[in-house]
Amino acid sequence: MAERSLSGLTEEEAIAVHDQFKTTFSAFIILAAVAHVLVWVWKPWF
């Protein structure tokens, strides 16, 4: 009998989900950094 993980995903599925998460999280961080720079250029906060 195969071991079941807490999430119910296989090792391959978990790797695929993690890779997609890393990609979207990195895109979010880059977008947030660009937004902060643009606001800083528009109206410096200190």
From Swiss-Prot:
Binding-site residues for a bacteriochlorophyll, renumbered to this chain: H18, H36
Source organism per UniProt: Magnetospirillum molischianum (Rhodospirillum molischianum)
Protein name: Light-harvesting protein B-800/850 beta 1 chain
General function of this protein: Antenna complexes are light-harvesting systems, which transfer the excitation energy to the reaction centers.
SUPFAM superfamilies registered for this protein in UniProt: Light-harvesting complex subunits
Family the entry assigns: Belongs to the antenna complex beta subunit family.
Pfam hit, one: LHC
Transmembrane annotation, as ranges: 20-42
UniProt membrane topology term: Single-pass type II membrane protein
Location(s) in or outside the cell: Cell inner membrane
Keywords: Antenna complex, Bacteriochlorophyll, Cell inner membrane, Cell membrane, Chlorophyll, Chromophore, Light-harvesting polypeptide, Magnesium, Membrane, Metal-binding, Transmembrane, Transmembrane helix
Ranges of the Cytoplasmic topological domain: 2-19
A molecular function (GO) term: metal ion binding
GO BP, sorted A to Z: photosynthesis, light reaction
Record's signal peptide: none
Underlying gene: B1
Subunit structure: The core complex is formed by different alpha and beta chains, binding bacteriochlorophyll molecules, and arranged most probably in tetrameric structures disposed around the reaction center.
GO CC field: plasma membrane; plasma membrane light-harvesting complex
Record topology, Periplasmic segments: 43-46
